[in-house]
Design a protein with these regions (language model features):
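Alpha-helical oligomerization segments
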Residues: 173, 182-203
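GST-like fold's C-terminal all-alpha helical module
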Residues: 79-184
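Short, hydrophobic secondary-structure boundary micro-motifs
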Residues: 61-65, 148-151, 176, 195-198
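GST-like domain detector, emphasizing the conserved glutathione-binding G-site
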Residues: 1-106
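Acidic carboxylate-rich catalytic motifs and surrounding loops in phosphoryl-/glycosyl-chemistry enzymes
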Residues: 14-16, 153, 199
Length: 203
């Protein structure tokens, strides 16, 4: 999203989720996404990547990184969003194009250690759906205008949108109208196309 907003050209390479060798080779850690810059520097820390790409600080990433209290508040908010979202969406995500049988099994085995068996997550779907309204209401209350910081899109909006967007795969879930408009506005400004990478070529 951030690279689209900043109009940065980049080449995307989708790695199988069970590819541990490539991330460790580039960044000494299995974590995605990874960006390798023109000077050869590679990073898998999203805010570091965006701050480096955003030389003019248009998204305010450097300002957020410099404000420890605000950064902690954002981390807490994203944790509150992530818990029900991931529990709901992971059983759906494993059937999206980036997963083959091997990487799907790897993902399920790894995530089940933290969240429990995926078939039980699917059975608890209504419980997780019921956990969403208070979290979404909190997000709505934090928007001081069309966006988190008022009239201008900032890094906080991209962080929030990247966590919420996965809910669009849940058939039984529908965003409140104002949050849907908020997310779609971010998507438009960032030229974001979900799963664009997987449909560049005919199969």
């Amino acid at each position: 999203m951030a690279l689209g907003f900043l109009e940065k050209e980049y080449e995307s390479q989708v790695l199988p989720y069970d590819d541990e060798e490539t991330p460790v080779k580039l960044c000494e850690k299995k974590m995605l996404p990874i960006v390798t810059f023109d000077d050869g520097y590679s990073s898998n820390e999203s805010l570091d990547i965006i701050a480096r790409a955003d030389e003019e600080n248009r998204l305010g990433t450097k300002s957020l990184l410099a404000d420890k209290e605000k950064l902690e508040q954002m981390d807490q908010l994203l944790g509150e969003i992530g818990s029900p979202v991931h529990n709901l969406a992971m059983p759906y995500w494993i059937w999206t194009p980036e997963f083959n049988e091997s990487s799907r099994r790897y993902f399920v085995d790894k995530k089940s250690k933290k969240r429990g068996p995926f078939h039980l997550l699917a059975q608890k779907k209504q419980q997780f759906l019921d956990e969403l309204p208070p979290v979404l209401t909190k997000v709505q209350g934090l928007l001081t205008g069309p966006y988190y910081n008022g009239e201008t899109l900032g890094i906080e909006d991209i962080m929030i949108a990247s966590h919420l967007w996965g809910l669009y795969v849940i058939p039984e879930f529908q965003f409140p109208n104002d949050l849907h408009r908020y997310l779609q506005s971010i998507g438009n400004l960032c030229k974001f196309n979900y799963h664009e990478d997987f449909w560049r070529q005919e199969i």
